[in-house]
Amino acid sequence: MSKKIKIYLAGPLFTLAEINDRKQQASLIRKTFKDELPNYELDLFNPIEVNDELGANAHKPNIFFYESDIKFIDQTDIAIIDIDNTDDGTMAEMGYFVALQKHVKPTLKIYILNTDWRVHKHRNEVLNKFLDGMILSHCQYFTNFTDLLNHLLIELKK
């Protein structure tokens, strides 16, 4: 019997590099689950794939994207949030996830990814203090995607 798991992949989608990052991360998550966690039924929500914000759905009103994202966010087991570029949408999703974890779903895991070496070197000076406090209180922080994925594997194999 397979275990169902819902993962939400959040992050900025403004540059070709960011879009490619989200697509590559989604591909690696799917491959990892297929190869390493065959007893899990993965439901991965990657907004760039699901919402098609830049394609066929680009003309839809913003409420469409909000409702689509929130519907999945409310059911998420694991949130992976890339904060290399702290855009408004990603930060709103992160705040929503933390509130959901704190008040509704304490089992929700929130993984933060920040690969910007400048932040690693000067974290106290670069990251907003409230944001960093939220991360320290409610999330697990990773500086590369491989470490995040390996940690996820270890946690799910327990």
Swiss-Prot record:
It comes from the Bacteria. Pfam families: Nuc_deoxyrib_tr. InterPro entries: Nucleoside_deoxyribTrfase. This is Uncharacterized protein UU063. It comes from Ureaplasma parvum serovar 3 (strain ATCC 700970). The lineage of its organism: Bacteria, Bacillati, Mycoplasmatota, Mycoplasmoidales, Mycoplasmoidaceae.
